[in-house]
Curated annotation (Swiss-Prot):
Species of origin: Lemna minor (Common duckweed)
Family: Belongs to the bacterial ribosomal protein bL20 family.
SUPFAM superfamilies the UniProt entry points to: Ribosomal protein L20
Classification via Gene3D superfamilies: 6.10.160.10, Ribosomal protein L20 (1.10.1900.20)
Pfam families on file: Ribosomal_L20
Top-rank taxon, per record: Eukaryota
Subcellular location: Plastid, Chloroplast
PANTHER family: 39S RIBOSOMAL PROTEIN L20
Protein name: Large ribosomal subunit protein bL20c
Gene Ontology terms: cellular component: chloroplast; ribonucleoprotein complex; ribosome
Function recorded in the entry: Binds directly to 23S ribosomal RNA and is necessary for the in vitro assembly process of the 50S ribosomal subunit. It is not involved in the protein synthesizing functions of that subunit.
Keywords tagged on the record: Chloroplast, Plastid, Ribonucleoprotein, Ribosomal protein, RNA-binding, rRNA-binding
Length: 117
């Protein structure tokens, strides 16, 4: 029986996987089986955390807006601010409001006072 020389396709596939896992530690960057397992695990974590990141940032923005709105008036809160914004049909999302709250608190106080009236 003659010797069969395998092509370069499997090697190319493995090197592509190794490039993905080159920053991993230990056997996770050297052994092909563990590389494939860790690659799948990394991609699952990345997919899961993209959704989690959106939730976390929204929570952060809400916390920042609430902290700044409660500084002046104790009774006035985040939920009342958002409700009044919708009533007045002002299109300011939470990200923009949080940036205004951090960079220019007076501007947010002016906006909230105008909305109340």
């Amino acid at each position: 029986m003659t010797r069969v020389k395998r092509g370069y396709i499997a090697r190319r596939r493995r090197t592509k996987i190794r490039l993905f896992a080159s920053s991993f530690r230990g056997a996770h960057s050297r052994l092909t089986r563990t590389i494939t397992q860790q690659k799948m695990r990394a991609l699952v974590s990345a997919y899961r955390d993209r959704g989690r990141q959106k939730r976390d940032f929204r929570r952060l923005w809400i916390t920042r807006i609430n902290a700044v709105t409660r500084e002046n008036e104790v009774s006035y809160s985040y939920i009342r601010l958002i409700h009044n914004l919708y009533k007045r049909q002002l299109l300011l999302n939470r990200k923009i409001l949080a940036q205004i709250a951090i960079l220019n608190k007076n501007c947010l106080h002016i906006i909230s006072k105008k909305i109340i009236k």
